[in-house]
Amino acid sequence: QANKIPGAYFAAAPTHDQAKKIFWDDLLKFSLSSTHVKRPNLSDRIIHLNSGSEIHVLGLDKPQRIEGIPWKGGGIDEFADIKPDAWESNIYPALNTVNPVDPDYRAWCWLLGVPDGLNHYYDLCQKSETSQDANFKVFHWMTSEIFPEMAEDAKKVMSIKQYKQEFEASFETAAGRIYEDYSTANHTTEVIKEH
């Protein structure tokens, strides 16, 4: 879309380092940045497209980094790991910053990631699934539908709750999560053997 509708776009993650590792190199390649008239800004992590659009790579460890720019759209990976109040305090208001040059345009945002207990991501997904608000939708891409062999291998080494959370996008309770693998069902009488 950034090639068709000029403006500011973002690719964000919970921390600046994560955003850089997840997005920066891939976006440089996918956008064919070596062919752009204006070189990427390496210190601010901004790719300047020939269409006039900019793609900003942002860390939301300081959620105010997203504020003050009239965004066209963007995506946030690992959304469950951002600060709990960042959506309401920073991100949603930033998406609604009106561009005086294009006052009727409304920014969009993809919230990506796997669940992490019943936190702010869960609350927003529940609200999206139960409301009649056409601005919010929830989509699931389960590993078993895309990579069935990978899903089967994961089932062998993960607890049921962890598998459901990581591979089926299921919101599992956080209560007792640390201890679930230490239940009596997992006890063994096997003796550790010398090597």
Regions found by a protein language model. Give the residues of each.
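Walker B catalytic acidic pair
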Residues: 77-79
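ATPase catalytic-site recognition across NTP-hydrolyzing enzymes
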Residues: 143-195
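Conserved RecA-like ASCE P-loop NTPase motor core of nucleic-acid helicases/translocases
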Residues: 7-19
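Short, conserved catalytic or adaptor-binding loops enriched in Gly and charged residues
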Residues: 46-50, 126-135, 182, 186-192
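Hydrophobic/aromatic beta-strand patches that form the interior of the parallel beta-sheet core
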Residues: 10, 58, 75, 110, ...
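ASCE P-loop NTPase helicase motor core
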Residues: 81-158
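Walker A/P-loop NTP-binding motif
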Residues: 1-5
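Inter-Walker segment of RecA-like/P-loop motor cores
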Residues: 18-72, 171
